[in-house]
From Swiss-Prot:
Designated name of the protein: DNA-binding protein HMf-1
The protein's role, per its UniProt record: Binds and compacts DNA (95 to 150 base pairs) to form nucleosome-like structures that contain positive DNA supercoils. Increases the resistance of DNA to thermal denaturation.
A molecular function (GO) term: double-stranded DNA binding
UniProt keywords, alphabetically: Chromosome, Cytoplasm, DNA-binding
Record organism: Methanothermus fervidus
Gene from which this protein is expressed: hmfA
Amino acid sequence: MGELPIAPIGRIIKNAGAERVSDDARIALAKVLEEMGEEIASEAVKLAKHAGRKTIKAEDIELARKMFK
C-alpha cells in the first residue's frame, strides 16, 4: 500500500458528491494522488535547485503544480 491513508481519500470523494465509496476506489485515487504528488515534488526540487536553494518552498510547489497541468 502507498503512503496516503485511504480514510481521508474517501472523505475527499464524498465531498465531491459520492454517497458511498468502495475501498478499491479509495485505493485507486490514493495511488493517482501519490503519483501526481511525486511528479509535482520532483519538479519543485528542480525549481529550488535552479534558484540555488536546498529548501523546497510553497511557491516551488505551486509553480510545479501549474506546470503539471
